[in-house]
Amino acid sequence: MIKSWTKKWFLILFLMASCSSYLVATTGEKYFKMATQAFKRGDYHKAVAFYKRSCNLRVGVGCTSLGSMYEDGDGVDQNITKAVFYYRRGCNLRNHLACASLGSMYEDGDGVQKNLPKAIYYYRRGCHLKGGVSCGSLGFMYFNGTGVKQNYAKALFLSKYACSLNYGISCNFVGYMYRNAKGVQKDLKKALANFKRGCHLKDGASCVSLGYMYEVGMDVKQNGEQALNLYKKGCYLKRGSGCHNVAVMYYTGKGVPKDLDKAISYYKKGCTLGFSGSCKVLEEVIGKKSDDLQDDAQNDTQDDMQ
């Protein structure tokens, strides 16, 4: 029970402020939805205006979306200074994607001067906000000793946490560490489980890693058909090594009937996705330079998932 009018008045003011904050947040979220709808329609002028309103009403994702538009020049003139400004606002408003974007920019020197301490700072903030991208990126930095003292234990811990936050890339990385005994005791069962999770989260590299385990029978029964399907899924998810492995299976007839046309088709896709091994094979097999393959691959309408 409140024993004095002073305390009671303070409580009333607190409740009024809470209601006001709720109304502001609700209004800000409405502007954010309006901005997103405008962006999808291609009405970038309105999108910017509504994102700004939502950002000014302290909706962090509104600030982040605006930062992304300015960083990529998506519907607006590219402006890195504005991108950093809005990402900072978004991060300060506890949007983990904004923190991750700042971390990435400072880690790579993408439009800003490279600054690893700042990258680590923003990744840590994003990870604290349960952002899988930030936790995973920080894990990679600890694994490689980039801007921090190399620490496999921290790398594994952060990567596991990122995987639990549905960041598939980190699931693949955890699997890699267990499969190859990188800073941890080799454990193929754990490797398999993490590759499966990453593939389920639509990380192409995880699907390829899982496919390899089925192809060679690593802690699972060897299964060429399963390997092929996983490689195809990796290819569909834009992983060049997945396309390449499908091509190799069709070219050699390993686990599937030989099919040179399908092999060449997948080699083209692998090359287009930047997998140099596919480009090299194509030059040897059909004598085409990798630069000449872009149109061929784009015109190839074969469904990777079939």
From Swiss-Prot:
Cysteine-cysteine disulfides: 55-63, 91-99, 127-135, 163-171, 199-207, 235-243, 271-279
Any single GO CC term annotated in Swiss-Prot or TrEMBL for this entry: extracellular region
Keywords noted in UniProt: Antibiotic resistance, Disulfide bond, Hydrolase, Repeat, Secreted, Signal, TPR repeat
Primary subcellular site in the record, as a coarse category: secreted
Signal peptide (from-to): 1-25
Record GO biological process: response to antibiotic
Catalytic activity: a beta-lactam + H2O = a substituted beta-amino acid
Record localization: Secreted
TPR repeat ranges per the UniProt record: 28-61, 96-133, 168-205, 240-277
EC number: 3.5.2.6
Classification via PROSITE patterns: PROKAR_LIPOPROTEIN (PS51257)
UniProt-recorded Gene Ontology molecular function terms: beta-lactamase activity
InterPro entries on file: HcpB-like, Sel1-like, TPR-like_helical_dom_sf
Primary enzyme class: hydrolase
Function: May hydrolyze 6-aminopenicillinic acid and 7-aminocephalosporanic acid (ACA) derivatives. Binds to penicillin.
Family listed: Belongs to the hcp beta-lactamase family.
Protein name listed in UniProt: Putative beta-lactamase HcpD
Organism: Helicobacter pylori (strain ATCC 700392 / 26695)
Organism ancestry: Bacteria, Pseudomonadati, Campylobacterota, Epsilonproteobacteria, Campylobacterales
